Amino acid sequence: MLDAAAAVVNLPAVVSATMQHSHCSYCGAAYAPDSAWPRLCAGCGETTWRNPLPVALVLLPVDDEAGRRGLVVVRRGIEPGYGELALPGGFIEVGESWREAAVRELREETGLIADADEVRLFDVHSGSRGTLMVCGLLPARAAADLPPSMPTDETLEWLVVTGPQPLAFPVLTRLMADYFASA
C-alpha cells in the first residue's frame, strides 16, 4: 500500500532523479528517455551540454599550543551528510573566482575570515554528482588566534582535527588524507 505522506516527502527526490535535464532549456521540448550527452533538441535544434558544477573547498591549517598541526572542519547542519564532518566549501557563484568562493564559504560555514589572495591551489578532483572540486590551501593559523565555534545556517560547529578521518563525502576524505600525508 502506498503511504501518501511518504510519497509527498520523497517527491522532490523522485522529481529530481527522473525529471532533471529531461527537457530542452531553450524551447522546453522533452528529450527522449536516456538521451546521451550532449543532447540535440528535436524541437529547436539547439545542443545542450552537461558541464560539471564547480565547487570551492578550503583547507585551513591550525597549529595548537603543543605544536600539532590540524585542519578546520565543519559538522554539517544540512543534508546530505547532516551531522557528519566536512571541509568548508560550496558552489562557486557566478562572478566570483574560486579563491573568493573558498573564503566566502569559510566565512559562511565557520565565521572565520580569510583573504582570497592568500589561497593557494592544493588540488582539483572530480566529485560525485557532476561536480569539479577546486581545493585551496590557506596559510596556517595559531589556534589561540581563532574565535570560538558558533553554529551557522549550514553547520552545527567547526572544529580542528589533527589527523585523517572519514568525512561526509569520499572526495573530501581523500583530500584530507592527501593534506596530512604532505604536511
Question: What are the residue ranges of the model-derived segments?
Answer:
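Compositionally biased, low-complexity intrinsically disordered regions
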Residues: 3-4
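Conserved hydrophobic "DFG−1" position in protein kinase catalytic cores
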Residues: 60-61, 73, 138, 160
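Unchanged
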Residues: 92-182
